[in-house]
Amino acid sequence: MENKVKIGKVYRHFKGNYYLVENVALDSETKERMVVYKPIYDRTDSKIRVRCEKMFLEEIDSSRPDNITGQKYRFELAKDIEKDYIQNK
């Protein structure tokens, strides 16, 4: 199964926090695809983040001490909280 970024979906970072993907942008210099996202775990933090798509989707070592979720990828689709987030938006 191919791992692709889905705009408008909630993702969980391997350290446990949740983020909403707002868009995918193109770096004007390198032409690299960039994921545009914001945190939803802290409603007072409205800072937009940008990370290259390759890194956003990269596999990580599930045995890393800071990988509290044990997940395979840096960011994974968070189906478990998406409905709650949409209802409480």
Question: What are these language model-derived features?
Answer:
Residues M1-K89:
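Mixed-charge, low-complexity intrinsically disordered regions
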